[in-house]
């Protein structure tokens, strides 16, 4: 997929913010998205008669919350009023009766970089906040009001925890415009839209769209497990660009053999100095001082012999169309 093709992530797309970057509660939006009792009933994760619990932590949690009955509209008003007056038991009842709503909403945010249990945990924080702020006299059902808070906490967690670099609120708002448009186009075009298609839809410069889309890219750790039955991490399958392949190794061996052959076209002193200086013919690479100490010559004399040897070797290589600088660094 090209760099200008978008993976659609609709994080926090409908949120409004004040000048301090705090979400503003939108009552009009809630009227449009209020879930019905039938929807909640259809989305119940476990039946009341389910008794078998599996070892999986998620299923265990879902099993536990399945025993909390939903509240009627009258019960919501009753417990909400008492919770506002500081009644702890009523507050707990409001929370426990709506935990399944959190799971229902959290499941919509799968494959966004956070595990389901993490999404549920964040959503529960939003639920608690909703219980603390809910005013039953406003005329909304609690599920409507709580949905807004649950979404905000989940979306904020995804935005903050799945990004290596946090984005400013105003950038997130602008990015969400592109993401919402991209999602709409993906349904209309039946494929993930390119930056050019998004730019045309929004009447924006393509460069601006491409820049914003790059902000939505995820950074993946090389230690990330591949998943499935494999125990390998991403690092285990990445190619090492610095490591020579078999064909490079063969070429290196051929080059070494050629260098040895060319060295033996020099006189004995030049051959020994170059071999010691550059780690050839079984020698370890050494400094001018070390070479002089080993063969009983001064540093300056070793340097002169090296220059003479390289000059002669350059002449030999030039006759074969080769460059000595590719072999040695003076």
UniProtKB/Swiss-Prot annotation:
The molecule here is called RNA polymerase sigma factor RpoS
**Single Gene Ontology BP term?**
regulation of DNA-templated transcription initiation
Give the PANTHER family listed for this entry. RNA POLYMERASE SIGMA FACTOR RPO, RNA POLYMERASE SIGMA FACTOR RPOS
- Chain intervals for the UniProt region annotation (Sigma-70 factor domain-4): 262-315
Arranged from A to Z, the UniProt key words for this protein are: Cytoplasm, DNA-binding, Sigma factor, Stress response, Transcription, Transcription regulation
Domain comment quoted from the record: The sigma-70 factor domain-2 mediates sequence-specific interaction with the -10 element in promoter DNA, and plays an important role in melting the double-stranded DNA and the formation of the transcription bubble. The sigma-70 factor domain-2 mediates interaction with the RNA polymerase subunits RpoB and RpoC. The sigma-70 factor domain-4 contains a helix-turn-helix (H-T-H) motif that mediates interaction with the -35 element in promoter DNA. The domain also mediates interaction with the RNA polymerase subunit RpoA.
> Phenotype upon knockout?
Stationary phase cells lose resistance to killing by endoribonuclease MazF.
Where are the stretches annotated Sigma-70 factor domain-2?
Answer: 94-164
Q: Does the keyword Translocase apply?
A: no
Q: Which organism is it from?
A: Escherichia coli (strain K12)
Q: Tell me, what is one Gene Ontology molecular-function annotation carried by this entry?
A: sigma factor activity
Q: What does this protein do?
A: Sigma factors are initiation factors that promote the attachment of RNA polymerase to specific initiation sites and are then released. This sigma factor is the master transcriptional regulator of the stationary phase and the general stress response. Controls, positively or negatively, the expression of several hundred genes, which are mainly involved in metabolism, transport, regulation and stress management. Protects stationary phase cells from killing induced by endoribonuclease MazF.
Going by the entry's taxonomy, the superkingdom of the source organism is recorded as Bacteria
Instruction: Using the UniProt record, give the first listed, main subcellular location.
Output: cytoplasm
| Induction info | Subject to complex regulation at multiple levels (transcription, translation, regulation of activity and degradation). Transcription is induced during entry into stationary phase and in response to different stresses. Transcription is repressed by antitoxin MqsA. mRNA stability is regulated by small RNA regulators and various proteins such as Hfq, CsdA, CspC and CspE. Finally, the cellular level of RpoS is regulated by proteolysis via RssB and the ClpXP protease.
Q: What is the effect of changing residue 173 to E?
A: Eliminates RpoS proteolysis. Lack of interaction with RssB
Entry-linked InterPro entries: RNA_pol_sigma-70_dom, RNA_pol_sigma70, RNA_pol_sigma70_r1_2, RNA_pol_sigma70_r2, RNA_pol_sigma70_r3, RNA_pol_sigma70_r4, RNA_pol_sigma_r2, RNA_pol_sigma_r3/r4-like
Region of interest (Sigma-70 factor domain-3), ranges = 174-249
Q: Name one GO cellular component term.
A: cytoplasm
**Chain positions of motif Interaction with polymerase core subunit RpoC:** 118-121
Q: Which residues bind DNA?
A: 288-307
Q: How does it assemble?
A: Interacts with the RNA polymerase core enzyme and RssB.
Positions of the UniProt region annotated as Sigma-70 factor domain-1: 56-89
The record's family statement is: Belongs to the sigma-70 factor family. RpoS subfamily.
The protein's location, in the record's own words, is: Cytoplasm
Phenotype upon changing residue 177 to K? 3-fold increase in RpoS half-life
